[in-house]
A protein has these predicted regions:
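Extracytoplasmic
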Residues: 133-135, 164-168, 231
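Catalytic cores and adjacent binding grooves of peptidoglycan-active enzymes
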Residues: 25-27, 179-242
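Mid-length scaffold segments of soluble, non-membrane domains
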Residues: 151, 160-189, 193
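Active-site acidic/histidine clusters and adjacent loop/turn architecture
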Residues: 71-141, 196, 200
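N-terminal secretory targeting signals
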Residues: 2-84
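Solvent-exposed coil/turn segments that connect beta secondary-structure elements
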Residues: 143-145, 174-176, 239-241
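Extended, low-complexity, intrinsically disordered C-terminal regulatory tails
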Residues: 57, 62-69, 73, 118-159, ...
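Substrate-binding cleft of extracellular glycoside hydrolase catalytic domains
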Residues: 69-85, 158-176
Length: 242
């Protein structure tokens, strides 16, 4: 049988142990300072979250492309773009051109598309450069707005009937004189290099390539089609993967 004083000491010891255990539990549960290096989940793109960091177009000297598991909704003339992927202002074998400011690079809000479209543009540009190392870069015009939708005259004096859901891109024909910029007349178009671009986009799986009726470019019927107001650029559309 314990002496009364011993009982007091035992009780005090148990109480001290409980206090220490409770403090340890509180220390474990108390949140530490936020980790500023981690972006909130809603700010990460699906591609970054699921499949690692953003991918480069081709090597470290070019801007990174943040593929975002984008989705084309609706149809090109009445649709929108979910999680649009932005084409860099420049990359291996291509530059961008703003048809409103008439200078390079194009403003970012004019060059958004689906992941597949951005990949196609980058791939065709690399192949174009490989085939013609001395040629000027492929000159890319409008894709879509960041969330797609109407791309009419209110966004500049050039209106697009399509370009609404990230499946369309304009590419300007190379010039015969080898100068940078957009050809002003069909006579200024380098037809040989332009035909090369058409062939590359067809080989890459383009669903439709619209070309100028006065530029005399050819391709598979039903894919390459002459269309008014396309004498200074070709218009490429890819299929909606669903």
């Amino acid at each position: 049988m314990l002496h009364p004083m011993s009982r007091v000491l035992v009780v005090l010891g148990l109480l001290a142990a409980l206090v220490l255990a409770g403090g340890a539990t509180m220390a474990i549960q108390r949140p530490g300072p936020p980790d500023r290096s981690v972006r909130p989940a809603e700010q990460r793109s699906p591609r970054q979250t699921v499949n690692g960091p953003p991918q480069t177009v081709n090597g470290p000297n070019y801007p990174r492309v943040r593929f975002r598991a984008s989705r084309a909704i609706g149809v090109p003339h009445a649709g929108r773009l979910a999680r649009g992927t932005r084409l860099p202002s420049r990359g291996p074998g291509f530059d961008t051109w703003d048809p409103i400011t008439r200078q390079s690079p194009s403003r970012g809000w004019r060059r958004n598309g689906t992941d597949d479209l951005v990949r196609m543009v980058a791939a065709v540009a690399r192949r174009y450069r490989a085939a013609r190392p001395g040629a000027l870069p492929m000159l890319v015009g409008d894709l879509s707005r960041p969330r797609g939708g109407d791309f009419g005259p209110q966004y500049g004096f050039i209106g697009h009937a399509t370009h609404q859901n990230g499946l369309d891109v304009d590419v300007y024909y190379p010039r015969r004189d080898g100068r940078r910029g957009v050809p002003k007349t069909p006579a200024q178009v380098d037809r040989r290099l332009s035909q090369r671009l058409v062939d590359l986009f067809v080989d890459a799986g383009a669903q439709t390539v619209l070309v100028g009726p006065n530029v005399a470019l050819r391709g598979p019927p039903g894919v390459v089609q002459p269309f008014p107001n396309h004498d200074n650029h070709l218009h490429v559309r890819i299929a909606n993967p669903g």
